[in-house]
Design a protein with these regions (language model features):
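Alpha-helical scaffold segments
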Residues: 2-206
Length: 206
């Protein structure tokens, strides 16, 4: 057994001990390796002490695993942390519905109680997320002037039928992922769509 193998084995043992022994984990929360600190968030007591850790990934783990941590992090300076809060906790998503970051707002749109407030958002990616999340909203948004929104509608096969001749190749490419439609799009004018068609017909559909 060489030195590197021993080192890897020791790391595995340490990781296993962290997730099974809270006292050991508490002694590791100041570890220099952020991945070790992230493992410590397995325990709520550790996570609460790591909630303001300088490493974004550690804070994300805190927010994802523990509601008490997420409630301290929903206004975190990093949008990826706020996004985790919005993704996992509906009441925090409600507080983030007007977040300055469009990815956070798009995540809020996954909640049925909040999506109605976002269908007219200024950001096309946010409106696209609304269309992707709820079929009944996609039906209302299918004639949007933004191709990104129409692309979101196209993930629904019954709506994609109405979009296979869309002016945007990006929208048609989404339509081409549906196997039942791909066979009708073999002669699409854009090679990028035809690539998707070929791939779909040779593999599986949505």
């Amino acid at each position: 057994m060489n030195e590197k193998t021993v080192e890897v084995s020791d790391q595995q043992d340490e990781s296993q001990k962290i997730i099974t022994d809270k006292i050991f984990a508490l002694n590791q929360i100041r570890h220099t390796d952020p991945l070790i600190r992230a493992l410590c968030t397995t325990w709520e007591e550790c996570a609460l002490q790591l909630v303001h850790d300088p490493d974004t990934f550690v804070r994300m783990e805190c927010a994802e695993k523990w509601q008490a941590c997420a409630e301290l992090l929903f206004d975190d300076g990093d949008p990826v942390v706020r996004k985790v809060c919005a993704e996992n906790y509906e009441h925090l998503a409600a507080k983030l519905i007007n977040d300055r970051d469009e990815n956070v707002r798009a995540t809020c749109s996954k909640w049925e109680t909040l999506v109605a407030e976002l269908i007219h958002d200024s950001s096309p990616p946010v409106r696209r997320s609304c269309a992707e999340s709820f079929h009944h909203l996609a039906e209302l948004m299918i004639n949007s002037s933004d191709w990104e929104v129409r692309a979101g509608c196209a993930i629904w096969e019954d709506l994609a039928v109405k979009l296979i001749d869309d002016v945007s190749w990006e929208v048609r490419a989404i339509c081409a992922h549906h196997k039942k439609l791909a066979s009708q799009m073999k002669d699409d004018s854009d090679w990028r769509v035809r690539v998707v068609v070929d791939s779909c017909l040779n593999e599986t559909s949505f």
